[in-house]
Amino acid sequence: MNKFLKSVADVLEVGSVTLDTPFRETEGWCSLKAFGLLVMLENDWGAPTGIDRFMELKTVRDLCREAFIAFAAGVLKVPRESLSGETACGSIPEWDSVNHLRLVMEAEPKFGVSYPLETIPGLKTVDDFISAFLV
């Protein structure tokens, strides 16, 4: 299990989660766990998320997208608001081939994932990076 999924599972006090887990439907869901996820996103992943935005999130994939966008914004040196799940390599000037490789190299230790060499050409969007997490 990668670092992000483990963090979410720990906050939710469940054995494991997948990207498609609807986190509000986990056993024992309560406002304390919601607060725990908000704190985790901000403190552990550098992704401060307001309550209104948090209420829009449904799955662990949505939480992961928030964390990955904050991470990518730091690597690319762009505002978080300029990125979304659909943002692709080359769609903004800062996401060039060099920064694309930086995203791959820095995401692996940060998120505890491994992108096999043959998958890297397929990592075109933020959501592609998340979907390719090997768990």
Task: Give the location of each predicted region.
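Phosphopantetheine-dependent thiolation modules in NRPS/PKS and related acyl-activating systems
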Residues: M1-V39, N43-E94, V98-M105, P109-V135
